[in-house]
Amino acid sequence: MSGKRKILSNKIYLYLTEFFAGMSVMAVELGASRLLAPYFSSSQIVWTIIIGTIMIAMALGNIYGGRAADKRPDPDRLYGRIILAAIWIALIPVIGKYVIIGISAVMIFSVNHMFLIWAAFAACMVIFVFPLFLLGTVTPSLVKFTVDDLGDSGKTVGMLNAFNTIGSIIGTFVPTFLTIPAVGTSITFLIFAGILLLLAILYFFSPYEDHGSGSARPGDGNKEQGRGRTSQGVSDENSGNVNEKTGSNDKEKGSNKGKNAAKITAGIIVFIVACFTGRSDSFAFWEKDLVFEGESVYNYLQVREDDKRTYLSTNVLFGVQSVYEKDGKLTGMYYDYAMAAPYMAGVKEKDGLDMLILGMGTGTYATQCNRFFDGIRVEGVEIDEDITRLAREYFHLSDEIPVYTYDGRAYLNAVKETYDVIMVDAYQDITIPFQMSSVEFFTMVKEHLNPGGVMVVNMNMRGQSEKQGITYALAQTISSVFPTCYQVNVRGTSNREFFASENAEILETMAKNLESEENGELLAMMQRVTENLEAYTPVRSVGNGEAGKIDGVMTDDQAPVELLGMQVIDELIADEVSYYKKIYQEGGIKGLLEAFEF
């Protein structure tokens, strides 16, 4: 071990090391969720994977750091590991998205079930475990370097843990509310990599302490001569040993100085390169027609357009969340099917109709209803104000349509107004929020409907089986609240529109209102909906005790929407890649390259 550096004489620096290490761990964890979300969603399942892999890395780092500190208690090695962690974190914005795409490609062809889970887990292990393993070595190492008296060891360890915890708290809030919304995920990684790098550089630029040989105490020269000679002989021998050790230490310091200079130089070079090459916030780097790509507090956001349409996506790999037809015609998507709800509520018989949309998105449904119906008053609720901004800018959402920045359920709790139609179209990435899928929520919706009012729910993940998956669970839950339920599948998509009301005659009301519809395009669409509408009869339990009870009703206490959604996503992915799997089985890599025209 080389000599002690002056900076270590002050425990404040060691406490700050613990502080910034704790802060960086949490910042990387939150950055991980934002890096993975555009590809795998930000569901509770993905969060569980992120937290689990990070805890594994930290535990292994704690074990290794403690053993390494006992075996060779050299602070140079600890701060060298911090430099290595900083380098790795700085490279995440540069290569992370390519690693995710590569892992996803491999998993698609090698995993038949739970694709998102396995792909997200593999991506976390490859990208995040190593730097967090290194940061996990910090705490046990610092305990070794800061505890110099067992009498106050508890106080010292307590201070270290306090600084780590405070750093973790700050590392939780700063990325979420400051850096990610302001500068994006990529630069957030670079900021915290830079902090770790600067912390280590300060250490390595600190000089070593000087240890002088001192002088003889007064009176030592008055000792008796014989004893003095003996002492002098021993002194000469010890002096020789000291000189030998000093020479050895000087050589070690020289060797370490060269190694440390190389570490610092490598860290600075990689960090500078990463700052120039990793600043891009583009997750869909292969897309060429994007008019906007960015991040909000809640979502990854991507807007692209072609000659006919404008699209919004909150996920790189799966689906489109909103579509706007530039020519003003119907989209052919679920919005058109959902326009049956105003007819069911008697839009042609009323002077005006009040509509609430929970999950406004870019406002396609609101825009269409305003365009095709007279006297309709639409209000929207959208939790992500950046999506509302994009809706006004790119999707021509009228300024006359109010949009409230609120959680859908919280909004219903806060208002007393009632509506003729309530559209429920709220999603967190590709899964419905659990708090908007329970019997308690749908009961709340019913309480905000006028007599004869209609709720329409957009279900975006219709599976192959009619009696399992998220759409089945939602249908069972809704039918436990509303006595009249109808459903219709959206042609060519995995969407299903589900209509519910206390009015048993909504089909008759719809038919009567369609008689006065003059728009041929809309009338043709409503005829298609009418022909494909099916009454939904809930499945009930059979047997003792629970006979007659509706099965599978989701509650606030138990609403496994993520797991149910994952089952359907597996089916959708299997359908999408089956064609390419067949090509791979028959023609291998060459066949795939030819299929993609490489």
Language-model features and meaning:
Residues 388:
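Short alpha-helix immediately C-terminal to the canonical SAM-binding loop
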Residues 1-293, 305-307, 318-320, 343-353, ...:
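Alpha-helical transmembrane segments of multi-pass membrane proteins
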Residues 411:
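Short acidic active-site motifs
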Residues 369:
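Aromatic pocket-lining residues of Rossmann-like dinucleotide-binding sites
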Residues 400-402:
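Short, conserved active-site loop motifs that form the nucleotide-linked donor/cofactor pocket
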Residues 258-322, 327-328, 334, 340-346, ...:
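Soluble small-group transferase modules, centered on the S-adenosyl donor enzyme superfamily
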Residues 338, 431-433, 464-469, 507-510:
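Extracytoplasmic/secreted cell-surface and envelope-processing proteins
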